[in-house]
Amino acid sequence: MLGTGITERLEENPLRKELIHHPFFKEVRSSAELDREKVGIFLGQWWHPLHYFPNFLSRTIDQLDMLEMKTAIGKILYQELGEGDPARAHERIYVTTMQEAGFDEATVAQAAPLEETRRLVQRYREASADRLSALGFVYGTEVADLAMVAGIGNAVRRVSGLKDLPWVDIHILQEPDHVAQVNEAIEPDFSAEEIDIIVANAEEMWSLWTNFFNRLRKVMFGTEELPAAAAA
């Protein structure tokens, strides 16, 4: 299990708190400006890290030496890919859920990435080339994921009127297990220096997501126009 010291460092980290309490989430809960077009922008940008995440996990497994760590991350990957049923894969449920909410597939899964989105996915890819950075990025994602998913749920419910969103529901069901698996994936005998590297990479992950939401907030609720390529 993850040692108490590193758990506290990660859970209480100000960069994590900055992300999960990002003002963007308040905007999607209460802004009178929120409309279907704005939510479509949000969905189209979220697709890119969602789509790449299984690749990231599989590359992370390749970097791990301990079987226990491979198994822990492998369970997350198994759930992400539908537990043997492609129809239950997270990205498939994402598209079908949003289609049921009235968004077409082009809006949800074919929008060009904004620069912050592109950089986010790029760093997932680069981090997965090293064991410690990969673990930091996994943890950085999993301990903040529910707050971000809740933001999507709030936005989609407000503009669609739907209450049941299967993609949100599966995250609520599986995310506690994902966090537990990440905890199991941290070796109990990591050195202090290795722990510092894991934490530093989790911090970078949170900063990348914060930049992602900073840009979305400008595009959706500020004065910045969506680039033509991302609007296509």
Q: Which residues are covered by each model-predicted region?
A:
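Non-heme di-metal
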Residues: 1-232
